[in-house]
A protein has these predicted regions:
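Bacterial N-terminal signal peptides that target proteins for export
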Residues: 1-8
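Sterically constrained small-residue positions within well-ordered secondary structures
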Residues: 11-14, 61
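Aromatic- and Gly/Pro-enriched helix-to-coil junctions and flexible linker segments
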Residues: 23-158
Length: 158
């Protein structure tokens, strides 16, 4: 039993130090683009509409299993910072930040819960430890708009 606890402690220690290193080193090219290419490109790749085209004909594109194009750094950060502030965070979130309800794209981050959590942690590290904010540019309902101070916490290193 003692060996089991020692092993569990070692795993947690390595996981913690690995997450810290990832938080400092996560970049679009090295970490996010490979996940995107594997998990997201089929619906959000080069054949998808840009954000404005998608918003103009959302039902048509959703019926064709196409979301807004995010296959470049520039396209992806439009769904993080502006004009669709927080969209990536809201859709990929596991629900721990949204009252227990995961975002509608969380399920596509991996085929197992472990893979989904690993990929989510990579996205969170890339956005920044304090930048994973689910707010929008404008207030909606009882959720206030994102503040300049909160926007300043978004990192998204290329």
């Amino acid at each position: 039993m003692r060996k089991l606890w020692a092993a569990a402690g070692a795993v947690l220690w390595f996981a913690g130090t690995g997450a810290g290193a990832l938080a400092q080193d996560a970049t679009y090219r090295k970490d996010i683009k490979p996940i995107f290419d594997q998990k997201c490109a089929a619906c959000h790749g080069a054949a998808s509409p840009n954000l404005q085209e998608f918003l103009e004909n959302q039902k048509k594109f959703e019926a064709a299993m196409k979301g807004p194009r995010m296959d470049s750094y520039a396209d992806l950060i439009m769904l993080i910072g502006w004009p669709d502030t927080g969209a990536v965070m809201r859709r990929l979130d596991d629900g721990k930040n949204a009252g227990g309800k995961p975002g509608n794209m969380y399920q596509y981050l991996g085929s197992t819960d472990e893979e989904r959590q690993k990929n989510l942690l990579t996205f969170k590290a890339w956005v920044g430890p304090e930048g994973w904010i689910l707010k929008r540019w404008n207030a909606r309902g009882n959720v206030p708009a994102i503040t300049k101070e909160e926007l300043d916490k978004i990192r998204v290193k290329y």
